[in-house]
């Protein structure tokens, strides 16, 4: 993928250049997140910041600009998760919030809700490493559920419910809250009832996590 970083220097049409770079760097993020390969993810962040943002003006192409900000947020989120890095996770939050400056619920409700869910994930990961952003994560997830309803988009709804379950499960252990542990298990049950196996396999060892939350609940029950 070294050619992706060099492509901006080629004398080609700006739209072709942008499409080429964007396609390459999205593959780079997918590969980096899958292995995981933090080096690949950092290269992707560099391309987003140094190559794509300069040719994706918010004033001229606001939707393209917001898309780059969103994808930048995803790459930073993967790095933050792999390295327990509050710095990258905070930068991911900033990138998602910038994307939401352009992507409005009224005009692009599904995209808006998806970015809210991604913002919630960044806040949740910050909370897990001591960032104290649990309420911000919950607010973002609640916003996503305003659009991603079970009736209209069950898979998206279940993915948000899964994220809420992960948030509340860890939060309940930190603050020793029985009601929160029970709410976490309810959310995880909602998710597992709807999501296909391949979706669940990409999140974490969910069965083990559910057992951990059940143990927390049982301990709090006394």
Which residues are covered by each model-predicted region?
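Defense-system signaling and execution modules centered on TIR/cGAS-STING-like, death/scaffold domains
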Residues: 1-35, 42-55, 186-189, 203-222
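Flexible helix-coil transition and linker loops at the boundaries of alpha-helical arrays
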Residues: 1-17, 34-35, 50-65, 100-112, ...
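Hydrophobic/aromatic packing residues within the alpha-helices of TPR/SEL1-like helical repeat arrays
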Residues: 1-2, 41, 48-52, 89, ...
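Conserved alpha-helical positions within TPR/SEL1-like repeat arrays
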Residues: 16-33, 63-81, 110-125, 156-166, ...
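Short coil/turn connectors between adjacent alpha-helices in alpha-solenoid helical repeat scaffolds
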Residues: 28-43, 77-91, 124-136, 170-183, ...
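Amphipathic coiled-coil alpha-helices
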Residues: 40-41, 68, 88-89, 115-116, ...
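Eukaryotic tandem repeat interaction scaffolds
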Residues: 94-101, 105-155, 159, 164
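TPR/TPR-like (Sel1-like) alpha-helical repeat modules
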Residues: 139-142, 178-199
């Amino acid at each position: 993928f070294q050619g992706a970083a060099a492509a901006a220097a080629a004398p080609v049409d700006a739209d072709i250049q942008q499409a080429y770079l964007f396609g390459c760097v999205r593959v780079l993020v997918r590969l980096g997140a899958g292995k995981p390969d933090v080096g690949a993810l950092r290269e992707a962040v560099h391309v987003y910041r140094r190559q794509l943002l300069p040719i994706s003006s918010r004033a001229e192409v606001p939707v393209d600009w917001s898309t780059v900000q969103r994808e930048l947020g995803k790459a930073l989120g993967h790095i933050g998760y792999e390295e327990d890095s509050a710095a990258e996770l905070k930068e991911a939050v900033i990138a998602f919030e910038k994307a939401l400056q352009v992507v409005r619920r009224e005009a692009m409700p599904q995209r808006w809700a998806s970015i809210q869910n991604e913002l919630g994930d960044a806040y949740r990961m910050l909370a897990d490493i001591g960032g104290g952003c649990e309420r911000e994560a919950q607010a973002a997830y609640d916003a996503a559920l305003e659009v991603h309803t079970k009736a209209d988009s069950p898979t998206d709804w279940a993915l948000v419910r899964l994220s809420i379950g992960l948030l509340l499960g860890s939060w309940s252990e930190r603050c020793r809250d029985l009601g929160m542990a029970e709410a976490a298990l309810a959310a995880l049950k909602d998710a597992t009832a709807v999501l296909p196996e391949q979706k669940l396999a990409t999140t974490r060892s969910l069965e083990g996590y559910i057992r951990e939350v059940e143990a927390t609940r049982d301990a709090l029950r006394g």
